[in-house]
Structures are given as structure tokens and as C-alpha cells.
Amino acid sequence: MAVKIKLKRLGKIRSPHYRIVVADSRTRRDGRAIEEIGKYHPTYNPSVMEVDAERVAYWLGVGAQPTEPVLAILKKTGDWQKFKGEPAPAPLLQPAEKAARPSFEAIGGEDEGKGEAITQKKKADKKDEAAAESSASEA
């Protein structure tokens, strides 16, 4: 049985996500896979490439052939060079850690509570008018 390491497409239209899978070469692109050995998310910045190096080494060792897109991913992660016995490539770009947003208190803001309302509330106006009318009728 001819085995290939290929990309299985997931996601929505214009939002692709791929799984790196080992499958029979005669199966459909998104068909049944023997094993899932990684992920590839090209729309993220930088794109995410997660590969299980042990399983890739095993499948390459037993004769699985990577497709061209998977071969490019394996070269970027260094798994292909490790299999061929070549020197490893430069490390991949890692996403920058997002700094926590400074809190309001850390900036120096002081919580003064609620200020006075610019407009009066309707219920309060009605009570004030009713009280004024009753005091006017008493006098």
C-alpha cells in the first residue's frame, strides 16, 4: 500500500485550517486518514505549524512519501533535514507574547465614584412635583 503524508483541509470558505495526516495515496484529500501527525494554520500571523516529530520520523522511515506542501512544512520545522541527516534550518519565527493590558489603577486613574447626573431621572421629577403640589395646596 502506497502511503502519503498530506494535508487534510478543514475550516470554512476563505478560512482554511489543515491537519497533516498519513493516508493511503488513493484516498480523497479530505478522506479517511490512517493517523493525524500535525496541524497547519496558514491564516494566523505567523502561521502555526505543529508536527509530531517522532511520528513523522517513523512514517518517513517506513516509506511514506510527503506531498510538496507537507515537504515544505517539514523543511521549515527541521524534520526533513533530521530524516536526511542534514544540518537543521534556522529556528522559526515565534509569535510575540502579548503583554497584559495595564489596569486602570496602574495607570494612575482614580475611581471617584459616580458623578452627578446631568439630567434628572423621570421618577424623581414626578415625586418632586407631587410633593410640591401637596405642599402648595396645604398652604
From Swiss-Prot:
Residues 84-139 are annotated as: Disordered. One of its GO terms (molecular function) is structural constituent of ribosome. This is Small ribosomal subunit protein bS16. Disulfide bonds: none annotated. GO terms for cellular component: cytoplasm; small ribosomal subunit. It comes from the Bacteria. Pfam families: Ribosomal_S16. Keywords: Ribonucleoprotein, Ribosomal protein. Belongs to the bacterial ribosomal protein bS16 family. The keyword Ribonucleoprotein applies. NCBIfam families: PRK14520.1 (NF011093), S16 (TIGR00002). One of its GO terms (biological process) is translation.
